[in-house]
Swiss-Prot record:
InterPro entries: P-loop_NTPase, RapZ-like, RapZ-like_N, RapZ_C. GO terms for molecular function: ATP binding; GTP binding. HAMAP family: RapZ_like. Coiled coil: none annotated. This is Nucleotide-binding protein Dred_3054. The keyword ATP-binding applies. The lineage of its organism: Bacteria, Bacillati, Bacillota, Clostridia, Eubacteriales. Keywords: ATP-binding, GTP-binding, Nucleotide-binding. It comes from Desulforamulus reducens (strain ATCC BAA-1160 / DSM 100696 / MI-1).
Length: 298
């Protein structure tokens, strides 16, 4: 939908309706969509979808991709879904419907293994309510633009399918985002780190008077740290190590990797190496975000 209201351009975001069988993988699908930058809302009553779409369309492009989960947990409200989708189309909104399903046998097994109760099950008859749900969803399945059967699909394989179908820029969407962060050990290790590297073994510029009040963002400090043979050797090994790890992390479906590099105060050595590692990884085509946590503490 692209319209002009009061001289203001209103553009439609990419709107994805996620629905399907309970236990078929909607939660995993939504997590993958969130990694792709989608604004996700779970269990939204169908009657609210048009109003939500209108609000998002008036966000001036701040929200470009939206995924709304609509399923039988909505109870009586769910029966409005088909009518609402029809109205969305009539109003000019662009939307897609992703339907996730699995075989009865697979769904029964998943519920047995998870020990969770099916939303429609009040009497312990899992197979019966699965079949009832399949019938309730028959019409909306017919409106689906994409159906994924997850019977023999792992979580990582499902994520790959979601990325392929909805990632837009597939090359960028499927690449790990590497955050390299410097820190000072005196202030603690970043709690969300995946890899922690202690570079306090390197010569400390703090003890050189003319470098003490500078940081690893300043060229004199960078030249001093990077001129050391031990630093050069360490960086070579570190870059090889990271390049070895990244494909394995991606294969496991990891979306982000945080590498924390620490020195005593988080001002000189760690900042220099964080900048250098970020620069080299960017040149090699990785998606990189560089941060300095403690550089302003002094």
């Amino acid at each position: 939908m692209s319209d002009s209201e009061g001289g203001v351009e209103v553009s439609s975001p990419r709107l994805l309706i996620v629905t399907g069988m309970s236990g078929a993988g909607k939660t995993q699908a939504v997590q993958s969509l969130e990694d792709l930058g989608y604004f996700c809302v779970d269990n939204l009553p169908p009657a609210l979808i048009p109003k939500f779409a209108e609000l998002v369309s008036q966000s001036n492009g701040k929200v470009e991709k939206v995924a709304l989960v609509v399923d039988i947990r909505g109870g009586a409200f769910f029966h409005q879904a088909i009518e609402v989708l029809h109205d969305l189309g009539e109003q000019g909104y662009r939307f897609e419907v992703l339907f996730l399903e699995a075989s009865d046998e697979t769904l029964v097994r998943r519920y047995k293994e998870s020990r969770r109760r099916h939303p429609l099950d009040n009497h312990g008859e899992v197979l019966k309510v699965i079949q009832e749900e399949r019938e309730l969803l028959r019409e909306i399945r017919g409106r689906a633009t994409k159906v994924i059967d997850t019977s023999n699909v792992s979580n990582n394989q499902l994520k790959e399918q979601i990325i392929t179908q909805y990632g837009g820029d597939k090359e960028n969407s499927n690449r790990l985002l590497i955050t390299v962060i410097s820190f000072g050990y005196k202030y603690g290790i970043p709690m969300d780190s995946d890899l922690v590297l202690d570079v306090r073994f390197l010569p400390n510029p703090y003890y050189i008077p003319e470098l003490r009040c500078l940081t690893g963002n300043d060229e004199p400090v960078q030249q001093h740290v990077m001129s050391q043979d031990v630093t050069k050797e360490f960086m070579e090994k570190l870059i090889d190590f990271v390049q070895f790890l990244v494909p394995h992390y991606q294969r496991e479906g990891k979306a982000t990797l945080m590498i924390a590099i620490g020195c005593t105060g988080g001002m000189h050595r760690s900042v220099t190496l964080t900048n250098k590692l970020g620069e080299v990884l960017s040149e090699k085509g990785y998606r990189v975000n560089v941060r300095h946590r403690d550089i302003m503490r002094v």
